[in-house]
Amino acid sequence: MSNHAEASVAPVEAYEPPYYVAVFTAVRTQDQSGYSETNARMEVLVKDVPGFLGMDHAQSPGGLSITVGYFRDADALTEWRCNAEHRAAQKRGQEEWYQSYTLHVAKVERSHGFTRAQAAQSPTAG
């Protein structure tokens, strides 16, 4: 049995609402030339946007990728959407890297999280 506690994978924290999320779901094409480099650049660039809170990313074995960006307010989200390098990456994505994608933007009104304690959990004899 694998021990998931050893992995460095964790969701972003539950931020204080309200805040905004941009949920990007995509299926990529076979040709991914330049994708990794551009994606890495976007991950660095978005961190410079005032109001950027964090990002989660997951990919299914079937090829669906999901990226969730968290932003403090609509202005931060707009700044990212209008960034010239980001716009160029979006254009290239439509031309080369994505078979299909969907973007959902929402205002988060409620948020909470859970983290299991690091101490071993064992049932109490009873």
Predicted regions and their residues:
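Conserved RNP beta-strands of RNA recognition motif
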Residues: 67-73
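Short, conserved catalytic or adaptor-binding loops enriched in Gly and charged residues
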Residues: 93-96
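Short S/T/G/P-rich N-terminal loop/turn motif that feeds into the first structured element of a domain
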Residues: 1-64, 75-82, 98-126
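Amphipathic alpha-helical interface segments used for dimerization/assembly
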Residues: 81, 89-90
